[in-house]
């Protein structure tokens, strides 16, 4: 049965909040090609998957927990287990060691094969369990006819699960404590998972009101003009963040909201609370260009905006979020004020041709953002673009769902660019960005240093503290990393190596002899580990997340 959070067709489970619930992400391993839809090109790593994948040992490697499942588990009263990144054997062991009344499985569309296999296993080993499927995989048309599940849930899952367990779907949301990332590696070095150095994830809302035709998130949560706010006001958001600060010992927050700055009243309320409490927090946000322009630079700096994921898409696209904005000027201005940017560009829009596409990619790379994501224009089930392409008869036959993720080849017939050429163009875009702008780690250091120079004497103590916190690593490990990158690139990309050297020397001049001493000791180590890492990667080395088991509300 296809269902949504507001569906009247939900029949509550007879055991209500006494039902035993298992929530699980799809099974690993992930970074390999297999019969269940895993792909080596599509590892369980957001950055290395679709942002820094051409940067070798300089690539930022990390994993992220299944935040949606964590939100659901924290907001139901039933005894529950969350199994995150299990192996197939671990999943089987869990459903045979405990008799679960409900098994909820979450995945994305490329995970279809794994979701289907997990449903088969539950039916075999725990036949009395109710199977619920959620996440973006639920957008596949007629998914309930393709897999053996009782419910396929589209949209927001907390309210749905509460309703199913006989609880109030409109009860206030309790936010779980979530570290934004773990298992970080760069230059071949494993970075310890220290909470003080890692942002906490806050999810203020789901969905996006902009409603871009390709956007799976917007479509999944109601489409254009629709969002589901968990926290309506800046006051509510502040209380959640203050709790995280105290319990997790963090001072930075990753705001998992598709367009956080679009809700200006909420953001300004939050700023007012931060000022009154003297909070020197760093915020990592998603935003559109039109939303950013609602603020002055001083407001962004006061709010603690330290990093923005910015949709650039294409200079000739018609998306409302880009109207009347010179994105080159905007990107340069933000970075000059210490705000790091992750630009996102689409390859293969309708107007792209073999004659103009490289020029557009060069335009994108010219923004000089700290990171750059390139994604193929991809009609994903559930989106307006998918419906349009179906209506026009342009969806390609025989494309495996496991390959519909925007990082491989077109899944539709483009007017001017072939399926194979789409992959060559995408791969070139990542390589060109790396060759032109250098490692993202170098760019981050540059932006942080620009922010330090501009604001370390700012009259507001909160701002001074924040930029000092963000610049602290420039004095130590980041400077050493710059030296290692400079040496590694001297023979292969001399122009970028020179730029890195110039930045390093300026940093050492600013911060003095102690910084040079740390670089002299640590730099050669990072040079060696980065070379070792590139040798490992050349031999096919991959990384997988460990399995997490979280249990709540079980009687002792």
Where are these regions (language model features)?
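Conserved beta-strand positions
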Residues: 23, 105, 133, 255-257, ...
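Radical SAM [4Fe-4S] cluster-binding motif and immediate context
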Residues: 184-342, 347-349, 355-358, 362
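Structural recognition of alpha->loop->beta junctions
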Residues: 144-161, 297, 302-308, 359-374
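Flexible glycine/acidic-rich beta-alpha junction loops that bind and position SAM and/or redox cofactors
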Residues: 30-33, 140-143, 265, 347-355, ...
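A structural motif corresponding to the C-terminal end of an alpha-helix
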Residues: 72-81, 247-248, 277, 333-341, ...
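Acidic, low-complexity intrinsically disordered segments
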Residues: 2-249
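Radical SAM enzyme core and accessory elements
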Residues: 1-46, 95-96, 101, 128, ...
């Amino acid at each position: 049965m296809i269902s949504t959070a507001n569906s009247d067709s939900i029949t509550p489970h007879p055991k209500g909040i006494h039902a035993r619930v298992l929530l699980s992400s799809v099974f690993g391993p992930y970074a390999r090609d297999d019969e269940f839809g895993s792909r080596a090109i599509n590892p369980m790593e957001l950055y290395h998957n679709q942002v820094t994948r051409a940067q070798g040992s300089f690539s930022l490697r990390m994993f992220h927990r299944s935040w949606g499942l964590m939100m659901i588990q924290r907001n139901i009263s039933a005894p529950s287990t969350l199994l995150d990144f299990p192996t197939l054997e671990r999943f089987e062991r869990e459903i045979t060691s405990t008799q679960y009344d409900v098994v909820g499985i979450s995945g994305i569309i490329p995970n279809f094969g794994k979701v289907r296999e997990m449903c088969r296993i539950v039916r075999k080993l725990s036949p009395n369990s109710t199977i619920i499927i959620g996440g973006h995989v639920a957008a596949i048309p007629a998914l309930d006819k393709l897999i053996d599940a009782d419910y396929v849930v589209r949209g927001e899952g907390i309210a749905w699960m509460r309703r199913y367990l006989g609880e109030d779907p409109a009860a206030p949301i309790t936010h779980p404590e979530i570290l934004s990332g773990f298992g970080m590696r760069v230059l071949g070095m494993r970075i310890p998972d220290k909470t003080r150095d890692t942002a906490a994830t806050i999810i203020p809302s789901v969905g996006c009101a902009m409603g871009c035709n390709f956007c799976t998130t917007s479509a999944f949560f109601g489409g254009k003009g629709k969002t589901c706010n968990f926290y309506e006001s800046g006051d509510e958001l502040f209380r959640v963040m203050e709790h995280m600060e105290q319990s997790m010992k963090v001072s930075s927050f990753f705001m998992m909201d598709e367009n956080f700055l679009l809700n200006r009243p909420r953001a300004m309320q939050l700023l007012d609370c931060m000022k009154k409490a003297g909070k020197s927090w760093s915020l990592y946000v998603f935003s559109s260009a039109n939303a950013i322009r609602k603020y002055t630079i001083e407001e962004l700096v006061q709010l603690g905006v330290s990093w923005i994921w910015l949709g650039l898409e294409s200079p000739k696209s018609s998306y409302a979020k880009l109207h009347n904005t010179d994105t080159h000027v905007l990107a340069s201005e933000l970075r000059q004020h210490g705000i790091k940017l992750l630009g996102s560009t689409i390859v293969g829009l309708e107007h792209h041709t073999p004659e103009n596409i490289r020029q557009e990619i060069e335009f994108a790379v010219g923004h000089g953002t700290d990171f750059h994501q390139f994604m193929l224009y991809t009609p994903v089930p559930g989106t307006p673009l998918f419906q349009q392409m179906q209506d026009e008869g342009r969806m390609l036959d025989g494309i495996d769902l496991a390959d519909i993720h925007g990082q491989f080849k077109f899944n539709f017939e483009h007017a001017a660019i072939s399926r194979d050429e789409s992959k060559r163009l995408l791969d070139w875009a990542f390589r060109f960005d790396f060759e032109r702008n250098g490692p993202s780690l170098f760019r981050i250091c540059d932006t942080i240093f620009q922010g330090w120079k501009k604001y370390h004497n700012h009259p507001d103590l909160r701002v001074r503290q924040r930029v000092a916190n963000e610049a602290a690593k420039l004095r130590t490990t980041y400077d050493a990393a710059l030296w290692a990158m400079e040496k590694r690139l001297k023979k292969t990309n001399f122009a970028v190596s020179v730029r890195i050297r110039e930045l390093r020397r300026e940093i050492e001049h600013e911060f003095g002899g102690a910084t040079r001493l740390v670089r002299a000791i640590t730099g050669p180590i990072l040079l060696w580990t980065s070379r070792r890492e590139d040798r490992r990667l050349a031999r096919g080395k991959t990384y997988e997340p460990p399995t997490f088991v979280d249990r709540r509300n079980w009687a002792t």
